[in-house]
């Protein structure tokens, strides 16, 4: 077992993967139906031919650029175990920063709270918000029917109540009324930068990555619509790319939102911008 892990780690290091040992352990645990701790507790357990074949297949796919989360079929986000595959963007810790800001913004809200997650993908944000605020009505939109199928599967598996709506950005929210909180982790990578991304990131849906010429195309549209979507004192909170926070702040101000705030992620990057309807800057 240890020899297998050492061999795989060396292969992954040579290939330039960011977390070679962790990737090797996660794939081995999956292939051998063990926890990572059990890999070391039973390091001398012989491996069957079928186990080794399964593991080699996972290693080959990882070396070809397939993300670990897709190989495992799930990813943890906010202590929720979410199903993921190539239909959806893989939830990232950066988006937990968006969730923290969103929860802070509605901390004093009571019954009747209405929340929308625009561009939900796997459903990560909507489901985490439904978990943290079970009294709220939570809606989630996505233009991709494949992504919505995955989000619905996650909601059913976790037993969380979210209303999923198919359509472009906020378009399907019209009949749902106005909201106290809108969150969105929209594509924010400039189109010209997509081909230069790491292979595993390029394996994710381009629809979930490509934010147009400057990365802000979809955010501009949502921000422009926000005043009609938000309740008085309602909040819009957006995840943004590195160096985009200032531009997004100006978009929110231009739409008449105030109480603009930026929140940094664990790496110190300004990752979230939020603003409130009907307040001065």
Residue ranges and their predicted role:
Residues 242-255:
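Short alpha-helix
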Residues 97-200:
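Conserved SAM/SAH cofactor-binding pocket of Class I
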Residues 27, 65, 95, 125, ...:
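Residue-level signal for inorganic ion chemistry
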Residues 1-20:
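Non-catalytic nucleic-acid substrate-recognition regions in nucleic-acid-modifying enzymes
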Residues 253-281:
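Core SAM-dependent methyltransferase catalytic element
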Residues 21, 26-105:
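Conserved AdoMet
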Residues 141-148, 199-231, 235, 241-243:
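Glycine-rich S-adenosyl-L-methionine
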Residues 12, 106, 155, 226, ...:
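Conserved hydrophobic residues forming the short capping helix/wall of the S-adenosyl-L-methionine
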